[in-house]
Amino acid sequence: MSSSERVAKVVLVDIEGTTTSISFVHDVLFPYAKQNVEKFLRDSWEEDDIKRIVQDLQQVPQYADYKALLSGPPTEVDVDLIAGFVRYLIDQDLKVTPMKTLQGLIWAQGYANGELKGHVYEDVPAAFEAWRAAGLQIAVYSSGSVAAQKLIFGHSLAGNLQPYLSAYFDTHVGHKQEQQSYKNIAKQLKEDPKQILFLTDIPGEAAAARCAGLQAIILKRPGNAALADDQKTGFELIPDFKPLHNLKVPVNKSQA
C-alpha cells in the first residue's frame, strides 16, 4: 500500500530519527544530562520524587554491574555514586526507565531556563497540522520518558506542538521491539490496531508493531542508521512526512 492510499485513525510517531534528529538526542540532550546530573541531584537529593528514582535505580540489573567496575565497594549511596551510575547508563545508551525519568527532570530545567530547544524536522509541524485537520489523532511512543517527550514538543524550534498531540507512551507500556507493547498502546487508545499507523526509523520496532496488527512505515532521515537489504523488504520507506500529508481517516461505508 502506498502512502497516498493509506487510511488510519491514529498516527503513532517515534521521536529519535523520526520527528527529531538522532544527533539532537545524542549530541545535545544526552551530554546535557551528563553534565548536569550531579548538580541536579545535589540540589534535589532530599525531595521525595528524587528519593524514589534513586531507590528504583538501585533495583535495575545494571547497578550491580556498575558497582563491580568501581575500585572498591561503595560505603553509602550518595550523589557521587548515583551520578556516576547515571553517566554510565547514558554512555552505554541503556534504556532504563528510572534513568529516563531523571533525565526528563534535568532536561525540564534546561528547557525552562532556555538552554534547550527541542529539534523537530521542518516537515513535522505541517504534517501534524494536516493530520489533525483530517481528523486523525497523533500519539507519541518513545523510549524517552513521557515528561521528556512533552518537553521536546512543548519547547520545540517550531514552537509549542503539544496541542497537536493526544497521547504519549514510554517504556512503561513495554519495550519498543516487543509486540505486546503495541497491543498495550492500542488498548489504551481504545483503537483497532489496524487503524494505527506507526512511524519509526528502526526495522525491529516496525516489525513488532506489524505483528501486533498495526500499520508501520520506516523513515530514512539523514543521519539514521543504514538499513540492510533484508530490513528494507516488506516495509514502505519514506524520507520524511511529506508523502503522508494526505493521510485520511477511513470512510464509514454506511455513510458513504
Swiss-Prot record:
Its main location: cytoplasm. Its cofactor is Mg(2+). Pathway: Amino-acid biosynthesis; L-methionine biosynthesis via salvage pathway; L-methionine from S-methyl-5-thio-alpha-D-ribose 1-phosphate: step 3/6; Amino-acid biosynthesis; L-methionine biosynthesis via salvage pathway; L-methionine from S-methyl-5-thio-alpha-D-ribose 1-phosphate: step 4/6. SUPFAM superfamilies: HAD-like. Substrate binds at S142, S143, K176. One of its GO terms (molecular function) is acireductone synthase activity. Binds 1 Mg(2+) ion per subunit. InterPro entries: Enolase-ppase_E1 (IPR023943), ENOPH1_eukaryotes (IPR027511), HAD-like_sf (IPR036412), HAD-SF_hydro_IA (IPR006439), HAD_sf (IPR023214). GO terms for cellular component: cytoplasm; nucleus. Keywords: Amino-acid biosynthesis, Cytoplasm, Hydrolase, Magnesium, Metal-binding, Methionine biosynthesis, Nucleus. Bifunctional enzyme that catalyzes the enolization of 2,3-diketo-5-methylthiopentyl-1-phosphate (DK-MTP-1-P) into the intermediate 2-hydroxy-3-keto-5-methylthiopentenyl-1-phosphate (HK-MTPenyl-1-P), which is then dephosphorylated to form the acireductone 1,2-dihydroxy-3-keto-5-methylthiopentene (DHK-MTPene). HAMAP family: Salvage_MtnC, Salvage_MtnC_euk. This is Enolase-phosphatase E1. It comes from Drosophila melanogaster. The gene is Enoph.
